[in-house]
Amino acid sequence: MMTTVDGFAISVAETGPKNGTVVVILAAEQRAPAAYDALCERLHNAGLRTIVIGADPRLTPKSAIGILDSLGVSWAVVVGDRTGADLAWELAATRLGRFAGLVAIDRGHPRVADADGGVRDDNCPPVEIATTVLVSSPVVRDAARDSQRFVFGDYRVVDLLGRRNAHESTAQLATEIVLRTSGW
């Protein structure tokens, strides 16, 4: 547990090689950081350091950056799983130079309407880094496709192959994250 700059405790798990490229994983709602252990193990095998930040509705870009600052992380690849992807998009769009890549699971850019027609943030700027969106349904695929106009960098939309969630698609998700950590 860590205390954020906003004064609330949040679960944070930092593991992997200390000198590896950092991957920040923003957990989905009702998923403990331990739910990402199998994914983190694969990422560690690729030489990557992982920081999993638990879900909390009070978590803001300011508090997420505060966590990274306290851990000495100046830049990373950011991964967001569903509700965590909402924050990941915002971080990637508003903290230029802090993130080298974005992987979002089942969420499009905040300016794109979701399945219910709602737009999460009309004012969210475009993302200027390489981005991958993994999707589990045709509706999310449509939102991901529409998000491309808000990404000024390499952009991929990938169907989740497993049983339609990140936990059961660990190998595929790890592969997509490793691709985003590469500078090629």
Feature map (PLM): residue ranges:
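Conserved acidic catalytic loop of the alpha/beta-hydrolase fold
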Residues: 59-76
